[in-house]
Amino acid sequence: MSSVNPVAAVEIEGLTVGVAARTLVRGLSMRIRAGEAWCVLGSNGAGKTTLLHTLVGLHRAAAGSIRLWAKPLADWSIEDAARIRGFLPQFIHDTFGASVLDLVLMGRHPHLSRWHWEGAADRELARAALEALGLAHLAERDITTLSGGERQRVAIAALLAQAPAILLLDEPITHLDLHHQIVVLQHLSALARDQGKAVIFSIHDLNLARRFATHALILMDDGIVRHGPAGEVMNAPVLSAAFGYPVLEMQAGERTIFIAE
């Protein structure tokens, strides 16, 4: 297991985020450290995607600050930021065909010197990412021939090949069957636990979130955010309030599960 860096991977102070006249996050202050896997929970329209976009730098906060490894987000160059943090968007659009391997190799571009092509080490990392997600047999397939679930896993593989210290993923298990949902979340959890990555992902499945996340950030009404260790903040009263529907908490052996009433 990797040692924990005393400096927070992501440090948020007084963050307020909104869209139009609506405040989604109000005055959020928190730290995300290396070795932690955070799930972002909330109802549709609560602001999960907007918050992730803000942490990446794609959406301007109304107030507050974000630091990556103690350095203000705005002070990172595009090139340097791409080396230390990676982002998987919720929607992916392909405008042209390419092989699966070539697309995953695109994740290595931030690490290449100008005018240099990918080398053997880059190809090894790309193939390892495909292998980790059960995609090695599709390496030479054209991405336009893939199913939605296969294409989603290829996008995640490209993020893995990028090898950032901070991974932000917007609904990474969308389009995936149960088996591949587990494979992806197991791998993300292992990246945090074994390699000291900071992992932040939005998700709708409460039980998978509770199983694989070490910490949870829950978007409530009126910009209120609950955050902390998943076992503490993920409980029936909080989740019922967040989703506007009664949620029951039960035990299945040593595992906590949530069901709708």
Protein language model annotation of sequence segments:
Residues L41-S43:
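The feature captures the beta-strand-to-loop junction immediately N-terminal to the Walker
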Residues D142-L146, E150:
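Conserved ABC ATPase signature
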Residues V56:
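Helix-to-loop junction immediately C-terminal to a conserved catalytic motif
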Residues L105, A120-L138:
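Conserved ABC ATPase "signature" region
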Residues G64-P72, A81:
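Conserved ABC transporter NBD signature motif
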Residues A216-P229:
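H-loop (His-switch) and adjacent beta-strand-loop-beta switch element
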Residues L167-E171:
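Catalytic Walker B motif of ABC-type/P-loop ATPase nucleotide-binding domains
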